[in-house]
Structure formats: C-alpha cells, structure tokens
Amino acid sequence: MTSITGMIDPFLLLATESHAEGEALIGFHFDFLESNILNLAILVGVLVFYGRKVVGNILSERRNQIAQAIQEAEEKQRTAAQALAKEKENLAQAQKEAARIHEAAIERAKTLRAEIAAQSERDIARLKETAAADLSSEQERVMAQLKKQIAEQAIVKAESQLKAQVDNNTQQRLIDRSIARLGG
C-alpha cells in the first residue's frame, strides 16, 4: 500500500497546486519544464490502458494470419512433395520404358541386319544360279548352232563329193538298194 500512496501523494500535490492556481485538476501545460513529465506519464498510461487491447488484438490477429499462412505453406509443401515424388516415379518409369524401347530397337536392328544379310546371300546365290543357267543355256544354244552349221557344211560337202564321184548309173543303183532295204 505504501507504494500506491507514494505515487498518489505527488499526484495529489500537483493537483492541489494546479487547482489553487485556478486550473483544472488535470491539465496540459505547455511549459516544457513543468508539464512534460506529467503529460508523458498520462500519455503512456492512456496508451498502455487502451493500446494493450488494440495491440493485443492486432498481434493476435497477425499471429493467426501467420499461423494460417504457415499451415497453407506446409500444405503446399506437402502437395508439392507428393507431386514431385509422383513425377519422379513417372520419370523413372519413362526412363525404364525408353531403355526397354531402345533395347528392343537394337534387337530389331540386329534381327533385320541378319535377315537382310541372309536375303542378300540368297539373292546372290539365285543370281549365280541364274547366271550359270543363262551361261549353260547360251552354251547349249551356241553348241546346237555350231552342230547345225557343221552338219549343214558336212551335207553340202558330202553332196558335192557325191556329185563329183557318183554318176547317174551309180545313183540309180544306190536308190534301188535303199528302196529294197526299206521293204519295197
């Protein structure tokens, strides 16, 4: 109690002095040395009394806004982390699929290379056979033509020799003999 009465006594003293001079109980003095401390004390008291609620409300509201912003940021972070994990999984699957497609393409290329090589060998063998057959048929044609020419030349030569060696009488005897052999 002594501390309260100790604070009230100077206040009462100032109030009685100001009342004695004809001023109000609490007044504002514009004399710097006399009234500045009292005015500041009153201003601080009013600010503390009324400002506590206002500042408390502002701080509470700000605290709630910050907490809500933190919760929203954490939720966004969780959502982003989930999306990132899903996209990483999709990327891994896509990379596996790309590797599988690449391996399949390599295998297909090897298979096609082998098929093309085999087909080329078959084509070469067929061309060789065709060329050999063409060569063989050409040889046969040339041989047949040569035989025909030789036979024609032999007949021409034989006829010329027969004409030179055989007279009409000998020709008639050969004809008769040939007819007799044939059954006539």
UniProtKB/Swiss-Prot annotation:
Transmembrane segments: 36-55
Membrane topology: Single-pass membrane protein
Pfam families per the UniProt record, alphabetical: ATP-synt_B
Cellular component GO terms, alphabetical: plasma membrane-derived thylakoid membrane; proton-transporting ATP synthase complex
Keyword annotations from UniProtKB, A to Z: ATP synthesis, CF(0), Hydrogen ion transport, Ion transport, Membrane, Thylakoid, Transmembrane, Transmembrane helix, Transport
Subcellular location: Cellular thylakoid membrane
Membrane among keywords: yes
GO molecular function list: proton-transporting ATP synthase activity, rotational mechanism
Matches recorded under CDD domains: ATP-synt_Fo_b (cd06503)
First and last residue of the signal peptide: none
Entry keyword Transport: yes
Functional summary from the UniProt entry: F(1)F(0) ATP synthase produces ATP from ADP in the presence of a proton or sodium gradient. F-type ATPases consist of two structural domains, F(1) containing the extramembraneous catalytic core and F(0) containing the membrane proton channel, linked together by a central stalk and a peripheral stalk. During catalysis, ATP synthesis in the catalytic domain of F(1) is coupled via a rotary mechanism of the central stalk subunits to proton translocation. Component of the F(0) channel, it forms part of the peripheral stalk, linking F(1) to F(0).
NCBIfam families tied to this protein: ATP_synt_b, PRK07352.1
HAMAP family tied to this protein: ATP_synth_b_bprime (MF_01398)
Record text on subunit structure and interactions: F-type ATPases have 2 components, F(1) - the catalytic core - and F(0) - the membrane proton channel. F(1) has five subunits: alpha(3), beta(3), gamma(1), delta(1), epsilon(1). F(0) has four main subunits: a(1), b(1), b'(1) and c(10-14). The alpha and beta chains form an alternating ring which encloses part of the gamma chain. F(1) is attached to F(0) by a central stalk formed by the gamma and epsilon chains, while a peripheral stalk is formed by the delta, b and b' chains.
Family named by the database record: Belongs to the ATPase B chain family.
Family annotation (PANTHER family): ATP SYNTHASE SUBUNIT B, CHLOROPLASTIC (PTHR34264:SF3)
Record protein name field: ATP synthase subunit b 1
Organism this protein belongs to: Crocosphaera subtropica (strain ATCC 51142 / BH68) (Cyanothece sp. (strain ATCC 51142))
Gene name, Swiss-Prot/TrEMBL: atpF1
